[in-house]
């Protein structure tokens, strides 16, 4: 009897876990969305020119002067850039 209860419980847990995995697969990958729809861009992702708040976190600032890439991309901020971004009051994370 204990074996049957344990087996039934295991099957229920397995069914719930597989359903949540399917849900995750159906969700849109945030990396595939344009920066404007994501709310903010990760490091080395396109960003909005002149808007450091378009880069996620306190570590990212928008850099439009990359020698090998056209356009603007988020980069790791230096100490002064981090301080300037903090005072801007960006609302993204």
Swiss-Prot record:
Residues 1-18 form the signal peptide. Residues 19-38 form a propeptide. It is found in: Secreted. One of its GO terms (molecular function) is toxin activity. GO terms for cellular component: extracellular region. The keyword DNA damage does not apply. Keywords: Disulfide bond, Secreted, Signal, Toxin. Its main location: secreted. The keyword Secreted applies. Expressed by the venom gland. Transmembrane segments: none annotated. Contains 5 disulfide bonds. Belongs to the neurotoxin 31 family. This is U12-lycotoxin-Ls1a. It comes from Lycosa singoriensis.
């Amino acid at each position: 009897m204990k074996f049957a209860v344990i087996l039934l419980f295991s099957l229920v847990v397995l069914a719930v876990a597989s359903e949540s995995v399917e849900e995750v697969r159906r969700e849109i990958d945030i990396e595939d969305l344009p920066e404007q729809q994501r709310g903010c861009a990760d490091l080395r992702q396109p960003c909005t020119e002149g808007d450091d708040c378009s880069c996620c976190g306190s570590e990212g600032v928008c850099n439009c002067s990359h020698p090998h890439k056209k356009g603007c991309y988020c980069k790791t901020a230096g100490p002064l850039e981090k301080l300037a971004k903090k005072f801007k009051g960006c609302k993204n994370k």
